[in-house]
UniProtKB/Swiss-Prot annotation:
Species assigned in the record: Prochlorococcus marinus subsp. pastoris (strain CCMP1986 / NIES-2087 / MED4)
GO molecular function list: small ribosomal subunit rRNA binding; structural constituent of ribosome
PANTHER family the record matches: MITOCHONDRIAL 28S RIBOSOMAL PROTEIN S6, SMALL RIBOSOMAL SUBUNIT PROTEIN BS6M
Sequence segments annotated as region (Disordered): 94-154
NCBIfam families named in the record: S6
Name of this protein: Small ribosomal subunit protein bS6
GO cellular component: cytoplasm; ribonucleoprotein complex; ribosome
């Protein structure tokens, strides 16, 4: 495993399975991935969500996201296991450009000075927009009044 590549696998489980079965599936796929040479970076259950379209007569599904690293050989085993499982209704694995981004801090990614900068930019943009709108109104009213004067001369 000299050449490590980052992957993300998202799979959808049937909505009617019990919560302990969901945990068993997550553990099973995590264990299978590690046994086949992959390294788990992050595993998250995203919860039950409505599907965009019906899949295998289901309108909802339980989403699970799995971020992992490996040489690529481990993907075949995990996808084969998902394909053979009746509880997995859809799965997709994509190659990532690099490692996972670091999670944002609890202040939602903005400090107070950045927030003030954004607010000042917003107020500047609003005032410039109002000035442009006023200029257009003035130009339109001037051209309308000059056209009216020309028609009176004729």
């Amino acid at each position: 495993m000299t050449d490590q590549i980052y992957y993300e696998t998202m799979y959808i489980l049937r909505p009617d399975i019990a919560e302990d079965e969901v945990t068993n599936h997550i553990d099973k796929y995590n264990k299978l991935l590690e046994e086949s040479g992959g390294k788990i970076l992050d595993s998250q259950m995203r919860g039950k969500r409505r599907l965009a379209y019906q899949i295998a007569k289901h309108r909802e599904g339980i989403y699970v996201q799995l971020s992992h690293q490996g040489d690529g050989q481990h993907i075949f085993k995990i996808e084969k296991a998902m394909r053979l499982s009746e509880d997995v209704i859809r799965y997709l694995t994509v190659k990532q450009e690099g490692p996972l981004p670091t999670p944002r801090s609890s202040n939602k990614g903005y400090n107070q000075s950045e927030k003030k900068d954004i607010e000042s930019i917003d107020s500047t943009n609003k005032s410039e927009f109002k000035e442009e709108a006023n200029d257009k109104k003035t130009a339109t009213s001037e051209s309308t009044s000059s056209q009216g004067k020309e028609s009176q001369k004729s």
